[in-house]
């Protein structure tokens, strides 16, 4: 299964890439929202998206809105936006789950597995 990891912080992308690969998934990476939409369009077999909110060019909320126009792919937000209202807004916009930074990679992977059940 392919998992798209989207974050403008290369260190976070690399960390999540390691955990995703160690769990037997095939990671695909993007560093902003526009790149994420391109990857989703060119890889229709992506099973899940791990998505940051605050990114250049196109933020994660806009990515969620665009994806939700024609897809029900699971979206797990991993964001530094930590207030209850941030989480609620992410879920209302169309995210399936929301984890705040700093995060425990084991928790993120548990949520990935849960969303892929």
Could you tell me what each predicted segment is?
Residues 65, 69, 74-117:
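Basic, amphipathic DNA-recognition helix from helix-turn-helix-like DNA-binding domains
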Residues 7, 52, 79:
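Active-site residues of response regulator receiver
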Residues 1-4, 116:
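Non-catalytic signal-transmission and effector/linker regions of two-component phosphorelay proteins
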Residues 29-48:
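Acidic, metal-coordinating helix/loop segments flanking the phosphotransfer/catalytic sites
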Residues 55:
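Receiver (REC) domain active-site loop signature in two-component systems and cognate sites
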Residues 6-7, 30, 49, 99:
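Conserved sequence signature across two-component system core domains
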Residues 10-28:
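Two-component/phosphorelay signaling modules centered on CheY-like receiver
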């Amino acid at each position: 299964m392919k998992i798209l990891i989207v974050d403008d912080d290369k260190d976070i992308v690399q960390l999540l890439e390691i955990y995703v690969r160690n769990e037997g998934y095939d990671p695909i990476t993007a560093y902003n929202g526009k790149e994420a939409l391109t990857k989703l369009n060119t890889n229709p077999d992506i099973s899940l998206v791990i998505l940051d909110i605050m990114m250049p060019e196109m933020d994660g909320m806009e990515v969620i809105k665009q994806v939700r126009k024609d897809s029900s792919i699971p979206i797990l937000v991993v964001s530094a936006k930590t207030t209850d209202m941030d989480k609620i807004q992410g879920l209302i916009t169309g995210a399936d789950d929301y984890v705040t930074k700093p995060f425990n990679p084991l928790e993120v992977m548990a949520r990935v597995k849960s969303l892929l059940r």
